[in-house]
Swiss-Prot record:
Keyword flag Transferase: no
GO cellular component, one term: plasma membrane
Residues that span the membrane, as ranges: 49-69, 93-113, 169-189, 232-252
GO molecular function, one term: high-affinity sulfate:proton symporter activity
Subcellular location, record wording: Cell inner membrane
Organism per entry: Pectobacterium atrosepticum (strain SCRI 1043 / ATCC BAA-672)
Protein name as catalogued: Sulfate transporter CysZ
Biological process, per Gene Ontology: cysteine biosynthetic process; sulfate assimilation
Length: 275
């Protein structure tokens, strides 16, 4: 047989399990990466890239949650009125679930809007932090460098919305089913939010390396438990007053550390998106 290489295309990456040399990084939980983000935002040379996402998050999330809390007194009685009579005896349990449901739905909505607006700066933060963590030369961070990436970044954000909206609508419809809407739906929404927030923040370093959106999701599924842990903590801290004002840059930094440990060495083998 000929010794020449086959002309057939190579198989797509299968995201095989990591080698033993990287076992330590691959056994770290999503909890580890979430709390690593709090430390990373204060690294010398990184703080200045945290400021803009932080300020935007304070303005958007602060204003949004202030508005939400002014509406809760009107919304909760309306939700409780939809509870069927045979579940009235559980109203003392369903009431906090109803509050949690509203907070979960709107916190993710507010977070999505804030991330859409701040996406170019979050991408820059991820890029600069990755260079810092890997000892590479810091990339250009000028206005022109940011501006040329804006169309690509905004296109990626639209892809995320296209993935999110159909699934979110189906879950939101569950809230209108008596009984299920006040019990099962909040749990499903929390799990969905955890997955979407993992996608949202882990995507910044993937997109910086021009890894396609579907390929990125496939890679995240290989470590779904850790990514769900990370997303769940981001979701929970988004509900906590004051802490939710700084959660955006923290999550970007934690997700970038996760990329460096688990996915960066695979990036050369991952199919790139078309320009």
């Amino acid at each position: 047989m000929s010794s020449e290489k086959s002309s057939f295309p190579e198989k797509p990456p299968s995201f095989e399990k990591p080698s033993h040399s990287n076992t330590a990084d691959h056994t770290r939980s999503g909890v580890h990466y979430f709390f690593a983000g709090w430390r990373l935002i204060s690294l010398p040379g990184i703080r200045r890239f945290v400021i803009l996402p932080l300020l935007m998050n304070i303005v958007l999330m602060g204003g949004a949650f202030w508005w939400l809390f002014t509406q809760l007194n009107d919304w909760i009685p309306q939700i409780m009125s939809h509870i069927p009579s045979w579940l009235q005896w559980l109203s003392y349990l369903i009431w906090p679930l109803a509050v949690l449901s509203i907070l979960l739905v709107f916190s993710y909505l507010f977070s999505t809007i804030a991330n859409f607006i701040a996406a170019p700066f979050n991408g820059l933060l991820a890029e600069q932090l990755e260079a810092k963590l890997t000892g590479q030369t810091l990339p250009d961070s000028g206005i022109l460098s940011i501006a040329k990436d804006v169309p690509r970044i905004m296109k990626r954000e639209v892809q995320k919305l296209a993935y999110y909206l159909p699934r979110a609508i189906v879950l939101l419809l569950l809230y209108f089913i008596p009984g299920i809407g006040q019990t099962v739906a909040p749990v499903l929404w929390f799990l969905f939010s955890a997955w979407m927030l993992a996608i949202q923040y882990c995507d910044y370093p993937f997109d910086n390396h021009k890894v396609g959106f579907s390929t990125m999701r496939q890679a995240l599924r290989r470590h779904k438990v850790a990514n769900m842990q990370f997303g769940a903590l981001v979701s929970l801290f988004t509900l906590v007053p004051f802490l939710n004002l700084v959660i955006m840059p923290v999550a970007v930094c934690g997700a970038t550390q996760l990329w460096v440990d688990r996915y960066r060495n695979l990036s050369a083998t991952l199919p790139k998106k078309s320009p």
